[in-house]
Design a protein with these regions (language model features):
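A common structural junction motif
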Residues: 163, 242-251
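PAPS/PAP-binding and catalytic site of the sulfotransferase fold
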Residues: 89-93, 238-241, 245
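Conserved two-metal-ion catalytic palm core of "right-hand" nucleic acid polymerases
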Residues: 1-155, 163-164
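Short helix-capping/linker segments at secondary-structure and domain boundaries
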Residues: 94-101, 208, 323-326
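Right-hand nucleic-acid polymerase module
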Residues: 6, 79, 88, 178, ...
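Beta-rich nucleic-acid/ligand-interaction surfaces
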Residues: 109-117, 225-227, 260-264
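Short Gly/Ser/Thr- and Asp/Glu-enriched loop/turn motifs at secondary-structure junctions
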Residues: 61-63, 218-222, 256
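Conserved polymerase palm-domain catalytic core
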Residues: 45, 52-53, 105, 123-221, ...
Length: 341
């Protein structure tokens, strides 16, 4: 029986914790209207939030919905600011508890990890596997429509496997079941959803690593890669994975799942070899297209140098993690900044 944790609620609803949660939720958003409104009567609002939680009267408010297009179109549902304070208060207490049960090679939305740590681990594993086997193959997969597919009942059961504090479970139930989705789906844009998405695949991680004994496995949110010396081994494994995801988690793999030689593995936004890393080709095409458009916009006076500098800095930030000096120079050469007379 897995260990379950109690005596967490007092920490969640403590005034100091809610105050810290307000500051975390307000970071880089201090001048938004909803943040200013909460801050105008800060102590009163913290106490009100505290009372709503203590008396089990809190419930999620309506989400703000919008689309973003970076790197691809995504539908975002952002909770109101007061809800984000509650989310921070919960996550700050329960996340360390769930962290103890997560595997080392899960990298998304975790302190001390992240996309570049995942990329480095993937390269390290490719290098190790090549030394061990010579020829290496990779199973590269991701979950189809992951956030909209997360089953509420399965997710809540995962909370009960780790948490026994009834008050914390009440709050988790409110967030999971009353955020505007029926039976399945969690909002992209909520802090709690990042934790829930990691929790949801933790049992899968342990099944891969502990039960199947797979060493070379790396996951970043719903993207994962597995290395093997044989295509046939990976094909058999793929069938097992598909069955496990359907039966245990009500999930399906993206049809674009591939099994290919581990040369230029496309993972976490880069193409990874044992000895070097290059930018993803489609990312470069997109940047070149944007830079050409930006040259025209600058020439006609529609954007200024500050706008250009911000986009160039973003591109250089992406490129600094790979071996792409000549590529960087080639892309920047396409950016021509000249005003029309």
């Amino acid at each position: 029986m897995p260990r379950r944790y109690g005596d967490l609620w007092d920490r969640v609803v403590a005034f100091d914790n809610i105050e810290r949660s307000y500051r975390a939720a307000a970071k880089n958003k201090r001048y938004r209207n909803d943040v200013l409104k909460y801050a105008a009567n800060l102590e009163e609002n913290i106490i009100n939030t505290q009372n709503l939680l203590v008396w089990h009267q809190w419930k999620p408010g309506p989400m703000r919905s919008f689309w973003v297009n970076d790197p691809k179109p995504r539908f975002i549902q952002a909770p109101p600011f007061s809800d984000r304070v509650v989310h921070h208060a919960l996550v700050s207490v329960v996340e360390p508890v769930f962290e103890r049960k997560m595997i080392e090679d899960s990298y998304a939305c975790r302190k001390g990890k992240g996309v570049h740590a995942a990329r480095r681990r993937a390269q390290e594993y490719i290098r190790m596997a090549k030394r061990e086997w010579g020829k290496v193959y990779v199973l590269k997969a991701d979950i189809s429509k992951y956030f909209p597919s997360i089953n509420h009942d399965v997710l809540f059961r995962m909370f009960t496997r780790t948490i026994k504090d009834r008050n914390v479970l009440w709050l988790a139930r409110q967030i999971i079941y009353k955020s505007g989705y029926k039976n399945r789906g969690i909002p992209v844009g909520a802090l709690t959803s990042q934790l829930e998405a990691n929790i949801y695949l933790t049992l899968f991680d342990h099944w891969i690593k502990d039960e199947l004994g797979i060493r070379y496995y790396v996951r970043y949110m719903d993207d994962f890669m597995i290395l093997s010396r044989s295509k046939s081994i990976l094909r058999e494994l793929l069938h097992e994975i598909e069955a496990y995801l359907v039966v245990e988690l009500s999930l399906a793999l993206n049809p674009k799942t591939t099994i290919v030689p581990a040369r230029g593995v496309d993972f976490c936004g880069y193409r990874i070899w044992p000895t070097h890393t290059l930018p993803r080709k489609r990312n470069l095409k997109k940047v070149r297209r944007r830079f050409r458009a930006m040259s025209n916009m600058y020439a006609s006076g529609r954007v200024d140098l500050n706008y250009v500098h911000a986009r160039v800095a973003s591109f250089l930030g992406y490129m600094k993690y790979c071996d792409g000096y000549r590529t960087t120079k080639s892309v920047l050469d396409e950016l021509v900044l000249k005003r029309k007379n």
